[in-house]
């Protein structure tokens, strides 16, 4: 009996060490007595959400969620029609306001996204850091953007100064999630600007994708991945694209992987496998492949991929 109690106590202690509580208290007076939900992304590529909690907003417009997280996680909260997002971290306490500019608008099929208003946000919280960085970067780029066309060399120099400043800031921050956020914000919002001295596509591939681990749980990494490989099937060599079509039609995963490996931006096996899933996802919305072929390949990947997370993503799509 003593042994069982000891093991139980140890398991409880380990659970506490791995997971930590967070709390969200919100004000949503426009939606009193309605249901409020809290979701988590199963994966960012499919965009599929799984329900974590449901509560009812009080007559006073107050709602509350309590949960556990082992690290920084992006969650979605909202009603059935209107949604917003929040990053939560261990021991995080959040006071937010959930207000729609058009609460009486019946066109809820527009799926309006609401921007949360935070109160008393801790300066060490990930939301504080992200919101502050986004505002600062937007202002910096706005201030120097005039130089891009009228003084290109000065613009390039100021971009260099920006990156040096960010490197210095990165050394002072211990949050790997925030550092990755900074890195892929620069990749998306700075390096994608067409300016003198801007990195080439191959340099961007090497800097942000080819030589880095895939950050499946980081929304900014996955957003950059989707931008970089957007309509990828239409950007590769036509002959390769046609051969890939035949491989998909035959349901030959080994062949489609082998064909994609010929492209310089798909040189890493795990990344290449993810690219293939993304190609199939985008093909659902165009005429490149019959829907039956797409679904068959996704089904095969969900059963046969050597990467467990890819099996999940393919299943979710």
Model-predicted regions and their roles:
Residues 21-174, 181-184, 189-208:
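A non-transmembrane, solvent-exposed segment enriched in polar/low-complexity residues
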Residues 155-163, 246-254, 288-295:
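Helix-turn-helix repeat elements of alpha-solenoid scaffolds
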Residues 285-317:
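N-proximal helix/coil linker or "cap" segments that precede and/or mark the start of modular domains
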Residues 175, 181-268:
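Charged, long alpha-helical assembly modules
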Residues 278-286:
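Structural detector for internal amphipathic alpha-helices that build alpha-solenoid repeat scaffolds
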Residues 158-169, 256-259, 297-301:
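Amphipathic alpha-helices of TPR/Sel1-like and other helical repeat/solenoid scaffolds
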Residues 1-27:
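Bacterial Sec-dependent N-terminal signal peptides
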Residues 172-177, 215, 303-309:
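Short solvent-exposed coil/turn linkers within tandem alpha-helical repeat scaffolds
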């Amino acid at each position: 009996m003593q042994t069982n109690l000891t093991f139980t106590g140890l398991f409880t202690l380990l659970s506490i060490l791995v997971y930590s509580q967070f709390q969200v208290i919100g004000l949503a007076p426009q939606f009193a007595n309605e249901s409020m939900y809290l979701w988590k992304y199963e994966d960012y590529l499919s965009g599929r959400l799984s329900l974590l909690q449901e509560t009812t907003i009080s007559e006073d417009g107050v709602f509350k969620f309590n949960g556990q997280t082992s690290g920084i996680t992006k969650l979605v909260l909202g009603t059935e029609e209107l949604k917003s997002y929040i990053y939560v971290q261990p021991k995080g306490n959040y006071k937010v306001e959930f207000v729609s500019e058009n609460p009486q608008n019946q066109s809820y099929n527009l799926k309006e996204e609401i921007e949360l208003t935070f109160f008393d946000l801790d300066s060490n919280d990930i939301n504080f850091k992200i919101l502050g960085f986004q505002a600062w970067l937007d202002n910096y780029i706005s201030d120097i953007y005039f130089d891009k066309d009228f003084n290109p060399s000065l613009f390039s120099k100021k971009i260099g100064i920006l990156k040096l400043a960010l490197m210095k800031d990165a050394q002072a921050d211990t949050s790997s999630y925030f550092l990755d956020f900074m890195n892929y914000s620069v990749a998306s919002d700075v390096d994608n600007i067409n300016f003198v001295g801007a990195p080439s596509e191959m340099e961007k591939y090497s800097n942000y994708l080819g030589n880095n681990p895939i950050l499946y749980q980081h929304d900014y990494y996955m957003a950059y991945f989707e931008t970089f490989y957007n309509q990828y099937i239409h950007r590769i060599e036509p002959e390769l694209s046609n051969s890939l079509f035949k491989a998909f039609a035959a349901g030959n995963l080994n062949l489609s992987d082998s064909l994609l490996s010929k492209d310089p931006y798909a040189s890493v096996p795990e990344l290449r496998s993810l690219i293939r899933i993304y190609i199939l996802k985008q093909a659902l919305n165009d005429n490149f492949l019959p829907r039956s072929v797409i679904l068959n390949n996704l089904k095969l990947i969900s059963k046969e991929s050597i990467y467990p997370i890819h099996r999940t993503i393919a299943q979710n799509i």
